[in-house]
């Protein structure tokens, strides 16, 4: 067989294979910026920002809260399906319903929606863009305001072992009330430290109970668990006769 052409040898690390003044190749899938000047755009990443730069506003963001873009996408899909209504009222209605039933992936909303369909249909569209809890987190301040103003605690606050003093914190997106990425509305009243502690405690208990379902214990009492949580059985060394 004849000699086959050999592929070009890659340049050694640290070398400069391009002639001075030439344009480096564009990587696949990248779009060159015609306005870029590599020599002048390097900048100093270690410089101290000016007072004006520090004063520039930056919107709060949280991966636990639905973004405005996601919410606009939800409304667009609802309208495309023929579910037309006041979007603020319709989505708030779903969030306040979840105030009672929870916003977990297993939540099954019931009843009609202001969009002219069922709440379950609205929830299905929501879940194409974000989790139900992320949407509820966004509307949590408004949910809190209505609940406190109407003296209307979540329906299952007693079953969740909340006290009368902390009952208004007995919903699973309570964190959204004070999250800066949530809807910006003045609060009817601030959550009390007791309500904040009760919500955090309940979350820890719920997390432990979920993990303990894989245990072989018949009780979650700390007398048995010593506060430890294990989702898989411990690895044991073989016995002397093994």
UniProtKB/Swiss-Prot annotation:
The keyword Ribonucleoprotein applies. One of its GO terms (molecular function) is structural molecule activity. InterPro entries: Pltvir_coat. It comes from the Viruses. Residues 219-232 have a biased composition (Polar residues). Residues 1-41, 219-242 are annotated as: Disordered. The keyword Ribonucleoprotein applies. One of its GO terms (cellular component) is ribonucleoprotein complex. Keywords: Capsid protein, Helical capsid protein, Ribonucleoprotein, Virion. Coiled coil: none annotated. Residues 1-16 have a biased composition (Pro residues). It is found in: Virion. Belongs to the potexvirus capsid protein family. Required for genome encapsidation. Forms ribonucleoprotein complexes along with TGB1 helicase and viral RNA. This is Coat protein.
């Amino acid at each position: 067989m004849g000699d086959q052409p050999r592929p070009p040898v890659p340049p050694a690390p640290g070398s400069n294979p391009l002639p001075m003044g030439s344009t480096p190749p564009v990587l696949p899938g990248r779009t060159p910026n015609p306005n870029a000047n590599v020599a002048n755009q390097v900048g100093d990443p270690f410089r101290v920002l000016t007072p004006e730069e520090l004063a520039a506003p930056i919107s709060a963001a949280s991966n636990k809260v639905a973004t405005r873009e996601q919410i606009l996408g939800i409304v667009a899909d609802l309208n495309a399906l023929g579910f037309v209504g006041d979007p603020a009222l319709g989505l708030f209605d779903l969030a306040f319903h979840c105030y009672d039933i929870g916003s977990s992936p297993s939540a099954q909303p019931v009843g009609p929606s202001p969009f002219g369909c069922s709440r379950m249909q609205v929830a299905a569209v929501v879940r194409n863009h974000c989790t139900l809890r992320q949407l509820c987190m966004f509307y949590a301040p408004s949910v809190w305001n209505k609940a406190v103003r109407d003296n209307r605690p979540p329906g299952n606050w007693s079953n969740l072992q909340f006290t009368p003093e902390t009952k208004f914190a007995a919903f699973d997106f309570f964190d959204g009330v004070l999250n800066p990425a949530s809807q910006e509305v003045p609060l009817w009243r601030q959550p009390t430290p007791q309500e904040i502690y009760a919500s955090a405690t309940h979350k820890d208990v719920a997390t432990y109970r979920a993990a303990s379902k894989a245990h072989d214990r018949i009780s979650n009492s700390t007398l048995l668990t010593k506060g430890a949580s294990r989702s898989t059985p411990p690895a044991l060394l073989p016995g002397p006769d093994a």
